[in-house]
Amino acid sequence: MALLEIQNLTKRFGGLTAVNQVNLEIQTGEILGLIGPNGAGKTTIFNMVTGIYPPTGGQIYFQGQRIAHPSLTWRKRLTTPVWWLSWLPIGTIREQWDEIRTLRPHEITERGIARTFQTIRLFNNLTVLENVMAGPHHRTRSGVWGALFRPPKQREEEVFIVAEAERYLTFMGLQEYRDELAKNLPYGHQRRLEIARALATEPSLLILDEPAAGLNEQESIELMALIRQIRASGVTVLLIEHDMKVVMSICERIVVLDYGKKIAEGSPAQIQNDPRVIEAYLGESEEDEEGGGAEEPGRTGVGEEV
């Protein structure tokens, strides 16, 4: 059984179809790359997998359980008995309701999916340690009253969270910066910090959206080593990346999107030599070649950054 399975996934924004009938599977322990020209629908897929957008059509399954479903119209909700009872704290009712709705982002995180973003999203005025402490919050149980009165259980959980945060800071090579404000870190370290916070949620699947963006060559090499270590620790990795050196070096399998559709899937060697992929990146066709091989604006070669 695939760890993550996407079936006929579609997303429309008004009259624009951003993702069109995409099928994709990722197996446990794999590093899978999702690539394509800008606007191909890559991040939209990530946003549907993590509950930010509900799909217009299709299904998403994680560990065999459906986590995303097209939004229910109000008419459909009113005629669905379980919707009327969904507020009740009864396990069987909640399970039935979960089968016909898209889970919220925090619920998907609790299921075992964590992500980073194209644009770094940190708590800039918190320390490096405090940023990572936000990761394992869903694994604790103390609430408002615990924070106010600080019973022994609250203090135990705080010790646990700090220890977990420091473990992931050490793993990502950031321990010496634990007391620095996040906004004062160099850009490359901010990228690492965002990954450390995601890892602190203890995910089975880590989704990285352009983790090498803005990094220099040495930082990219170090990032690749870290991603391999993450996979070796038992975490499956799904990534979007425009740096083809990174993609071709660490991904066992690559899926290519163009204009919202999957056009190719295979090993790095297969993808590099696939004429459909070359055409998508170069914008070439037989007519283009006759006219001098004109390049479509905004698209570059498979071996170059996009």
Give the label of every model feature segment.
Residues M1-E290, V306:
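Glycine-rich phosphate-binding loops of nucleotide-dependent enzymes
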Residues G293-E305:
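Intrinsic disorder/low-complexity segments
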